Amino acid sequence: MRRWKHLNPSLTLEGRAEAITEAAGREGIPSIFIAVSGDQLVGSAALVRNDMDTKLDLTPWLAAVYVKEGFRRQGVATDLIARCEIEAARSNASVWYLYTELASGLYEKLGWRHLERCGYKGVTVDVMRKQITS
């Protein structure tokens, strides 16, 4: 999870593992979903209550969307995001949010709309929102 370490430098590997364990294996928020190919972990996505400590009024959030190189552009991220959206709908959410540094184009193709561009933890991010379809 080095991809996002600069956003939470104080969170240790053990802390990340604990958060994932807490979110795994249950319904609702938080939830984490993984994609596997054979015995390889190839992607992940999470549904969390809050993902930006500066926007605590917005909830829930799509977070930790990642697909391993070699498995990208095959629909893995789209499938993981769709599964998170199903879980958000089951939790009675009507809108959900995300922030991204680099993948606005992907999310726009999936129906997400820009809410704002802002600085967050030293980087510029796009905050996006999407109506949840049940």
Question: Where are the regions a protein language model picked out?
Answer:
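Active-site beta-strand termini and strand-to-loop segments that position acidic
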Residues: 36-38, 130-131
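Active-site rim helix/loop that mediates acceptor-substrate recognition in acyltransferases
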Residues: 5-34, 42
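Conserved acetyl-CoA-binding loop-helix of GNAT-fold acetyltransferases
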Residues: 63-67, 73-86
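Conserved acetyl-CoA-binding loop of GNAT-fold acetyltransferases
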Residues: 108-118
